[in-house]
Amino acid sequence: MKDYFLAEWTKTRKIQLLVIGIAFLSFSSMIGLGIYFANRDVLIDGTQSLVLWGQLTFYNSTLLYPPMLAIIAGLLLVPEFERKTLDMLKANQVSMRKLYLGKLMSSFLLILPIQLLLLLIFIVAAKIDGISFDLSLATHVKWIALSLLSSFPIITLQSYITVKTRNFSKGVGVATIGSMLNFVLIFINESFTKFFPYSQPMIGLRSRALQDMTFLEFILFITVNIVFSFIFYQ
């Protein structure tokens, strides 16, 4: 398995994908920070850092994060079809399951620094604004970890779509539609988002709730993410 991962990691266009991820994060962060500071004067003391977190993560997790994951999944998979290397690998009895798992691990390592950068932006913005954290920093780190976990069902879903269509644009288009449907579900009945794959990063980051999950919410979150990841990984 190690050899599969190293082979995939070596040929991954890491700089290109990181630049894309940082660009998406920068754009969503500007929106969130702009809204926060525009309404800074009307915020109640003791809630500022939570509102900052909510604004900073909401537009990222709902609007741009799923398409970003679709782009990463697409750029990891589509070149294999264009070069027709999959047929050659199958002929040489290379394990497609291990190959795909190597790509999933590569995507995780690409997403990790982007999400850590999101946490850093939050910390720096809070320091600039001169506010203290309403919750411990460890809590926000935990929410970042949950957002990483919730990335897997989207990546596996987007990989499934990309493999079936062999088309980069269609995969990104589906993720964009998924992001818009997430907004619709929020306004119709937010409870539906608990079972919608494109809503999972928002739930993991607690962008709307702004408080820790209860035990039952955590179990449901883990179950939904495992089920979706397993279904589309197959």
Residues covered by each model-derived region:
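Terminal transmembrane helical anchor/hairpin motif
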Residues: 34-53, 172-234
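Cytoplasmic juxtamembrane interface segments
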Residues: 1-10, 77-90, 144, 148-169
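Hydrophobic/aromatic residues in alpha-helical transmembrane segments
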Residues: 69-73, 121, 157-158, 197, ...
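Secretory targeting signals
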Residues: 24-69, 101-166, 205-220
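Pore- or pathway-lining transmembrane helices of multi-pass membrane proteins that form conduits
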Residues: 20-26, 165-183
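Aromatic- and glycine-rich beta-strand/loop motifs that create alpha-glucan
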Residues: 1-25
